[in-house]
């Protein structure tokens, strides 16, 4: 992303005129069913001219606009006025945004993803998913078509977002293809809407946070957690006892799911070496004992 910022700084005035020549409703019509509601907290990443941020503010949302280009940020803040909060931040770090300690009902990443190097996208997506409120929506638009100027762009795909969504426990709700609204023949777009499910108690999101952000140093704990989640999803009636804020499950059921999910991994043997839990190849899995 940083390699393209000088272009946006140099051409901010022209680009803002170009972006503001089309309306939010026209550009984002494909995901109208997911537009923000009054009172929603919205994060607009790569806010550019402020067109989208201003529209969402007028719709009743509380909008924070993220823009790494100083010139675009200046132009955009003038366009929206003080009702929209502007922050100098960027993917994949979003460090200043994280420091706000906020969660958002909608995160819009419009015309940004193609600037991110593929090696940065997993981290960026994890940051975005962690900023979502329960039932929050993450909307990413994908630009297809090479730039004819000094901006840096990389290939993008819906399949990549589907994979990243699965890894971060998000659900893909909507995918749409559309022509370029600025009538550039060599450019076309896809829009992907993803959501963070919520069970109503907030516990699902706590568990999700552990799974997504665990450093994997204790793999058996993560494996057990995933096993319990599978049981909770498929066999809620298997609970033996629910008193004292705890539940009891048949150990045989836990063992069965554990074996079904992880026995094949334990059996892996590549040139005499099995799957490793430790950087020391002489050590096996910590939870596998001789007896």
Stretches with model-predicted labels:
Residues 214-223:
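Structural motif
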Residues 204-214:
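Domain-level detector for secreted/extracellular nuclease and nuclease-toxin modules, and
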Residues 130-133:
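Short, conserved loop/helix-junction motifs that constitute active-site signature segments
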Residues 108:
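A conserved beta-strand element that flanks and buttresses the S-adenosyl-L-methionine
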Residues 1-39, 43, 48-99, 116-123, ...:
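Class I (Rossmann-like) S-adenosyl-L-methionine-dependent methyltransferase catalytic domain
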Residues 111-112:
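Short catalytic micro-motifs in class I SAM-dependent methyltransferases
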């Amino acid at each position: 992303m940083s390699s393209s910022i000088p272009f946006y700084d140099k051409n901010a005035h022209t680009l803002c005129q170009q972006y503001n020549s089309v309306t939010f409703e026209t550009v984002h019509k494909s995901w109208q069913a997911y537009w923000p509601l009054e009172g929603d907290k919205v994060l607009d990443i790569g806010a550019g001219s402020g067109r989208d941020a201003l529209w969402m503010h007028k719709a009743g949302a509380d909008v924070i606009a993220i823009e790494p280009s100083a010139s675009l940020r200046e132009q955009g803040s003038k366009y929206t006025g003080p009702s929209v909060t502007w922050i100098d931040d960027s993917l994949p770090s979003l460090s200043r945004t994280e420091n706000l300690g906020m969660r958002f009902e909608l995160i819009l990443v419009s015309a940004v993803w193609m600037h991110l190097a593929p090696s940065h996208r997993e981290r960026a997506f994890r940051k975005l998913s962690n900023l979502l409120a329960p039932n929050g929506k993450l909307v990413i638009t994908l630009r297809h078509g090479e730039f004819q100027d000094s901006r840096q762009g990389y290939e993008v795909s819906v399949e990549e977002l589907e994979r990243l969504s699965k890894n971060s426990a998000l659900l893909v709700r909507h995918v749409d293809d559309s022509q370029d609204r600025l009538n550039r023949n060599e450019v076309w777009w896809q829009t992907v809407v993803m959501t963070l499910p919520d069970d109503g108690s907030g516990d699902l999101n706590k568990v999700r946070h552990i799974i997504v952000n665990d450093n994997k140093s204790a793999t058996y704990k993560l494996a057990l957690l995933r096993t319990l989640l599978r049981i909770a999803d498929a066999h809620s009636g298997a609970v033996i006892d629910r008193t004292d804020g705890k539940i009891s499950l048949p150990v045989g059921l836990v063992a069965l799911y554990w074996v079904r999910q992880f026995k094949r991994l334990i059996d892996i043997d590549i040139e005499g070496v099995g799957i490793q839990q430790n950087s020391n190849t002489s050590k096996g899995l910590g939870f596998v004992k001789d007896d």
